[in-house]
A protein has these predicted regions:
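Short catalytic/ligand-binding loop motif for oxyanion handling, primarily in non-cytosolic enzymes
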Residues: 136-139, 176-181
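C-terminal beta-strand of the catalytic ATP-binding
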Residues: 243-247
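Conserved S-adenosyl-L-methionine
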Residues: 165-176
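Short, glycine-/aromatic-enriched active-site segment of Class I SAM-dependent methyltransferases
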Residues: 127-149, 153-158
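A short glycine-rich, Lys/Arg-flanked "PGG" loop and its adjoining helix->strand segment in the class I
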Residues: 111-126
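Conserved N-terminal segment of class I S-adenosyl-L-methionine
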Residues: 1-91, 97-101, 111-114, 150, ...
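Short, electropositive alpha-helical surface patch
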Residues: 182-191
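A short His-aromatic
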Residues: 102-106
Length: 247
């Protein structure tokens, strides 16, 4: 099966917001027992998987897109398969952890995916997930990214609780700085991307180049990190979940 999306190679897949979110996930990954087997679902272009492997874990991946799985095999040498998150082609308890970043919101059957994640995680293992938060923040960016939903905190907790996992953390992130970035920069860019081809738009090409500037991305990420000063506020554009399988 081949699945492609217009947003899959856009600058924000490489830019500061994406890098910041990967850092949030990795802060939890590094708490896992060393050397374990980690499934990244969906693996996408492999940015998270590469970091997980670099931290000393054995990485496996699944994605609905053949191109994504092939790219990861070639670029990382990791085992990556094409498949459906509601029917994971792995045995029960195969992994010490599953990571899933900005994926559940795309699925018609997110509950089925949560049950499958719980099935393939070993007893005592963890799922580390990020999703967009709060219906009140729905925008044209969600339409552009083909989201099915944004999550309330309790909805995410119940999703994994009903799948048989114990939620250890369900925390908002990204307020106020990332949310301001989303509103003032990312939303106008996504509206423009929805109407125009990057190859024919000088402004979008400039944004793409900026999104690949390590210095600029690092600077903006440092600014985003200031959001941690406001982490006590139960609000933000994203949610981080850590859930553990009862064992």
């Amino acid at each position: 099966m081949t699945t492609t999306h217009p947003w899959g190679t856009q600058p924000e897949m490489f830019g500061p917001r994406h890098e910041h979110r990967l850092g949030i996930i990795m802060s939890e990954v590094r708490k896992l027992p060393a050397g374990g087997r980690v499934l990244d679902a969906a693996i996408g272009l492999g940015q998270l998987a590469g970091r997980v492997r670099g931290a000393g874990y054995r990485v496996f991946g699944i994605d609905a897109a053949f191109e994504a799985a092939l790219h990861v095999r070639r670029s990382l040498g990791a085992i990556a398969v094409v498949g459906d998150m509601t029917r994971l082609p792995f045995r029960d308890g195969a992994f010490g952890a599953v990571t899933t970043g900005e994926t559940l919101e795309h699925l018609d059957d997110d509950a089925g995916a949560a049950r499958e994640i719980a099935r393939v995680v070993a007893p005592g293992g963890a799922c580390i997930a990020t999703v967009p938060a709060l219906r009140s923040l729905w925008s044209a960016s969600d339409d552009y990214y083909e989201h099915r939903r944004r999550y309330a905190r309790q909805e995410l907790v119940e999703l994994f609780g009903d799948a048989g996992m114990q939620v250890e953390k369900a925390a908002f992130w990204g307020f106020p700085i990332v949310l301001t970035y989303d509103t003032l920069f990312l939303l106008p860019m996504n509206k423009r991307r929805a109407r125009r081809e990057v190859a024919r738009d000088a402004a979008l090409q400039s944004v793409a180049r900026a999104g690949r500037s390590r210095a600029l991305v690092g600077l903006v990420r440092a600014i985003f990190a200031l959001d941690r000063l406001f982490s006590w506020i139960p609000f933000g554009p994203g949610l981080l979940l850590v859930a553990r399988k009862r064992g």
